[in-house]
């Protein structure tokens, strides 16, 4: 809208007044004066349009750069905020779950201890022919039943706790991967993801991930250098439409270097 308006204004420039003052003291025919005035006015309008388009292009370019900059800053802040909120939320869930199931977990541990003690008492009674009164048998049966219930509940609780720990590790792993690869290209991110696939989150994950990211960056630089070398033909051989053997040897050597880079990364783990 602004571009069309400026161009339209430039095309409406009236140069006839300035020409009248120029030709005031010159003896020239009206036809020549009109022809010259037409050419002069067309030239002025043409340059005015080009100047307007140039200014509009610069303004648009600056606006796009500002928008892109603001967009990147907003995305970075959003990612950081999401990661912090996710970490806090997961920590809260873990603490809440442990608080809610503390009694059940404690009972499970106590049940195992009680089972061991009860088994030892039974063996002791049998060895020494100790007779247990009938009224005590009911108490023992009730305790065994309660013990069985706790034994059945304990595996479920521990399985749920392990699942929550695994989910926490998964989120922390994804956050670390996202933060480490945010400055990489999409192809570089895919390479890093492929190399860390199967690696579980641990204390050493961050250092291993950093090493892989650096190796991927270096390998991409090597690939760019090799591509430039291959695409640059030999000056003397250009007329014969072929690439020299030296370039082919360099390309082969570069490919071997890239393979060695990934081999070094794999050997670290």
From Swiss-Prot:
The keyword Membrane does not apply. The keyword rRNA-binding does not apply. Keywords: Viral capsid assembly, Viral release from host cell, Virion. It comes from the Viruses. GO terms for cellular component: virion component. Belongs to the T4likevirus capsid assembly scaffolding protein family. This is Capsid assembly scaffolding protein.
